[in-house]
């Protein structure tokens, strides 16, 4: 699709065998039937629920058939599988004038919203970055759809897109992570949820302090802010009692616990050894935070790139966003790569971030979000240790 025509939203294609591309060659040995079973089990589909799948025809195509068969076997309605939009088609619209782009955005959003009216469950399957993507207008429509409540819910199954470096930006996914991710789907989910519940109790009980060997020393309180448990449950019952939008967006592999602290209680500093900003790398980046706001920046190299990025991001870019703590015991890092598995969901990995946190129940609004990961942090609450140097302590597992 080129020019300014709408994406083919009604072309819910039947699946036919497609050749595996080089991008998916490393996934040839995966057990797609078992992966599909894990996804469907997480959903706890009710009879008659309507399911829409989004996919890249040249990446994880082997998963589509087993998914659709298992959807039907549960008595749910397989509405079909819709391809992600080609990135080149989206780029073709960037040369249009502002008014034309705005009109296209609204038209796309309305059309996709109409499609979603017939859906209870939306499945995000992996895609190849730079080749396929979800248009911003459709992402906007999905958010509004989720916010209508009820049993509406999504499974996010991003796979290679979750392979990130500690600066929060994507790294180059390695084949070894495919087996790591598959193993990380096969965990004790009840034990995971119990460990997250224990952590919530501790994190609510006092002042949280996060420290790293490189100099991060940040404290805050969570108060009565909602915690988002990525515990692998995407049932309609959970969706019905969702407190924040992220409670309806369930990630597989599972494992992270997320919260937006009370913004005015966040004080201290975050030290980031290296972070990419555009085509530059900032080194020894230090963020001084007072009452949830970044009040001072320093870096050994390329501070100008950091300043430019935060200025472009607006007010939200200088506001603290969230704490995330990983709990999945099988999303382990390796000595062979600096990559972190699946968005830092591995046990003991800490996420600190800046930007809009409304989807977590916070008060920071804007269009900016930037994550930073710390695989060697210590987290304590009034002296009681939850994570010590990147390892969950006994009793926190």
Regions found by a protein language model. Name each.
Residues 15, 21-267, 277, 389, ...:
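Active-site bordering "gate/hinge" segments
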Residues 267, 280, 296-363:
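Dual-mode signal for accessory low-complexity, basic/Gly-rich regions
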């Amino acid at each position: 699709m080129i020019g300014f025509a709408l994406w083919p939203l009604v072309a819910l294609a039947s699946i036919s065998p497609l050749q595996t591309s080089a991008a998916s060659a490393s996934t040839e040995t995966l057990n797609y039937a078992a992966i599909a079973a894990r996804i469907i089990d997480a959903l706890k589909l009710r009879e008659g629920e309507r399911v829409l799948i989004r996919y890249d025809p040249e990446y994880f195509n082997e998963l589509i058939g087993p998914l659709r068969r298992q959807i039907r076997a549960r008595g749910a309605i397989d509405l079909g599988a819709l391809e992600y939009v080609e990135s080149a088609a989206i780029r073709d619209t960037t040369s249009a004038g502002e008014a034309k782009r705005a009109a296209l955005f609204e038209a796309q959003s309305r059309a996709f919203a109409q499609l979603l009216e017939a859906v209870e469950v939306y499945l995000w399957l992996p895609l190849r970055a730079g080749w396929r993507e979800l248009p911003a207008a459709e992402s906007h429509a999905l958010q509004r759809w989720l916010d209508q409540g009820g049993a509406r819910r999504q499974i996010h199954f991003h796979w290679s897109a979750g392979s990130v470096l500690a600066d929060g930006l994507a790294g180059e996914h390695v084949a070894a992570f495919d087996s790591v991710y598959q193993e990380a789907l096969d965990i004790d989910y009840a034990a995971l949820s119990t460990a997250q519940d224990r952590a919530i109790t501790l994190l609510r009980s006092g002042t949280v302090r996060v420290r790293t060997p490189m100099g991060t020393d940040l404290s805050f309180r969570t108060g009565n802010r909602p915690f988002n448990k990525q515990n692998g449950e995407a049932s309609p019952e959970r969706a019905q009692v969702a407190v924040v939008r992220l409670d309806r967006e369930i990630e597989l592999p599972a494992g992270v616990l997320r919260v937006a602290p009370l913004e005015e209680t966040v004080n201290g500093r975050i030290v980031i050894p290296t972070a990419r900003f555009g085509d530059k790398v900032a080194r020894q980046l230090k963020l001084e935070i007072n009452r949830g706001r970044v009040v001072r920046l320093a870096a050994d190299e390329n501070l100008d790139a950091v300043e430019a990025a935060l200025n472009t991001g607006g007010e939200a870019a200088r506001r603290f966003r969230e704490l995330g703590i990983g709990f999945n015991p099988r999303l382990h890092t390796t000595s062979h790569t600096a990559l972190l598995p699946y968005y830092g969901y591995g046990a003991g990995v800490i996420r600190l971030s800046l930007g809009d946190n409304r989807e977590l129940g916070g008060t920071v609004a804007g269009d900016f979000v930037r994550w930073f990961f710390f695989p060697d942090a210590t987290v304590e609450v009034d002296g009681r240790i939850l994570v010590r140097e990147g390892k969950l302590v006994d009793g926190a597992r």
